[in-house]
C-alpha cells in the first residue's frame, strides 16, 4: 500500500495562514496555554528550550511523545514539534500523532550527516532552517512548506538571524535579474535545484513563507525581523527564560503585529522585566554553533 502524502499547495497554504504571527516554544501544557492566551498563532512542543539544550550538552532528541500529546490537548492553535535532521522514524512518529507541523531542526542533534528528510513523502508539512538561498532552495526541493532563519538558537542574540534574513533576501533579489543560463550556473554553484531557483526568479520571492528564528529575546528583536522582511517570528528561549514570560509573550506578539509602531513598542518595553541572559556569538566555537548543523 502506498503512503498518502499531502499536496504541496495545501501544505504551503497552511503555513501561509501563520503569516504575521508568533510561534512560541513550550515544554508543557501550562506554557502552551500562556502562549495561546498571549496571541501566538502556533506553539512548538519540545522537551527543553534551546538555551537549556545548549547548557546540558550531549545528544538532543525529539521530545517524549507524552509532552507533545499534553500540549496538543491543552490548546486549540496549531502544534509543531521538532525532530532530528534526517531521522525518518522520529518524523513518522510525530506525523502519526497528528501534529500540525514538524520542524526538522538543527536545535536537536542531527541523526544523519548526509541526508535531510524527503519531506515530500509525508502528509504533514515541514518547517526547516536556512542561512542562505542555497539552503533555502534545497529544503524547498525536498518538500519544506515553510522556512525560518537558523539564527543562533538559545543565545538571546539576534545578530545571526539578521544576517541570515538579509542574506536570503539579497540573494533572491540578485536572482531576479539573472537569465536562464545564469540561473543554471547559480544552481550548480550553490547546490540548489534549478526548478526551484527558476520559480523564485519568475515570482520575485520564495515560494514558501520565511519566518525569523534564533535569538529573538525582546519585542524590539521581533519588530526588527519583521522590518527586514520576515513573514513572522519564532521565539524559543526568549519568552520562558525571561523574568515575566506572560508579559514578554504578549509584548512580542504585539510588536510583531505592529512592528512599525515605535511608540507602542517603546511602551511595551517599559513594562517588561529583565530579558533572558544573552550570549556573544564570538564566544561560541564553530562546534557549539547550532546553525552549522545541516547543509
UniProtKB/Swiss-Prot annotation:
GO molecular function: pyridoxal 5'-phosphate synthase (glutamine hydrolysing) activity
Pfam families membership: SOR_SNZ
Residue sites binding D-glyceraldehyde 3-phosphate per the record: 166
Superkingdom of the organism of origin: Bacteria
Binding site for D-ribose 5-phosphate: 25, 154, 215, 236-237
Pathway: Cofactor biosynthesis; pyridoxal 5'-phosphate biosynthesis
Enzyme class: lyase
Keywords: Lyase, Pyridoxal phosphate, Schiff base
Gene Ontology biological process terms from the UniProt entry: amino acid metabolic process; pyridoxal phosphate biosynthetic process; pyridoxine biosynthetic process
Catalysed reaction, written as an equation: aldehydo-D-ribose 5-phosphate + D-glyceraldehyde 3-phosphate + L-glutamine = pyridoxal 5'-phosphate + L-glutamate + phosphate + 3 H2O + H(+)
Positions of the catalytic residues: 82
Family matches, as CDD domains: pdxS (cd04727)
InterPro entries documented for this protein: Aldolase_TIM (IPR013785), PdxS/SNZ (IPR001852), PdxS/SNZ_N (IPR033755), RibuloseP-bd_barrel (IPR011060)
UniProt EC number: 4.3.3.6
Keyword Lyase: yes
SUPFAM superfamilies cross-referenced by the UniProt entry: Ribulose-phoshate binding barrel
Subunit structure: In the presence of PdxT, forms a dodecamer of heterodimers.
Stated family: Belongs to the PdxS/SNZ family.
Function summary: Catalyzes the formation of pyridoxal 5'-phosphate from ribose 5-phosphate (RBP), glyceraldehyde 3-phosphate (G3P) and ammonia. The ammonia is provided by the PdxT subunit. Can also use ribulose 5-phosphate and dihydroxyacetone phosphate as substrates, resulting from enzyme-catalyzed isomerization of RBP and G3P, respectively.
Protein name: Pyridoxal 5'-phosphate synthase subunit PdxS
Species annotation: Staphylococcus saprophyticus subsp. saprophyticus (strain ATCC 15305 / DSM 20229 / NCIMB 8711 / NCTC 7292 / S-41)
Encoding gene (name): pdxS
Amino acid at each position: 500500500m502506498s503512503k498518502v502524502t499531502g499536496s504541496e499547495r495545501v501544505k504551503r497554504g497552511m503555513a501561509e495562514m501563520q503569516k504575521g504571527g508568533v510561534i512560541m516554544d513550550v515544554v508543557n501544557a501550562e506554557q502552551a496555554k500562556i502562549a495561546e492566551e498571549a496571541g501566538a498563532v502556533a506553539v512548538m512542543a519540545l522537551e527543553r528550550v534551546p538555551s537549556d539544550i545548549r547548557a546540558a550538552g550531549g545528544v538532543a532528541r525529539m521530545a517524549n511523545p507524552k509532552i507533545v500529546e499534553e500540549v496538543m490537548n491543552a490548546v486549540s492553535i496549531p502544534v509543531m514539534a521538532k525532530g532530528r535532521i534526517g531521522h525518518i522514524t522520529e518524523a513518522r512518529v510525530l506525523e502519526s500523532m497528528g501534529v500540525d507541523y514538524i520542524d526538522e531542526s538543527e536545535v536537536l542533534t542531527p541523526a544523519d550527516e548526509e541526508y535531510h528528510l524527503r519531506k515530500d513523502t509525508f502528509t504533514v508539512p515541514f518547517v526547516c532552517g536556512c542561512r542562505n538561498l542555497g539552503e533555502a532552495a534545497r529544503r524547498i526541493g525536498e518538500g519544506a512548506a515553510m522556512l525560518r532563519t537558523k539564527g543562533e538558537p538559545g543565545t538571546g542574540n539576534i545578530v545571526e538571524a539578521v544576517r541570515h534574513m538579509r542574506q536570503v533576501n539579497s540573494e533572491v533579489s540578485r536572482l531576479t535579474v539573472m537569465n536562464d543560463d545564469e540561473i543554471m550556473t547559480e544552481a550548480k554553484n550553490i547546490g540548489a535545484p534549478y526548478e526551484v531557483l527558476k520559480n523564485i526568479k519568475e515570482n520575485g520571492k520564495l515560494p514558501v513563507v520565511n519566518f525569523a528564528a534564533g535569538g529573538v529575546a525582546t519585542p524590539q528583536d521581533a519588530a526588527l525581523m519583521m522590518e527586514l522582511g520576515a513573514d513572522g517570528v519564532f521565539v524559543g528561549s526568549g519568552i520562558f527564560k525571561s523574568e515575566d514570560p506572560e508579559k514578554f509573550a504578549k509584548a512580542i506578539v504585539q510588536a510583531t503585529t505592529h512592528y512599525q509602531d515605535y511608540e507602542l513598542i517603546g511602551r511595551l518595553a517599559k513594562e517588561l522585566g529583565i530579558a533572558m541572559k544573552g550570549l556573544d556569538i564570538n564566544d561560541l566555537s564553530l562546534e557549539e554553533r547550532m546553525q552549522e548543523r545541516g547543509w
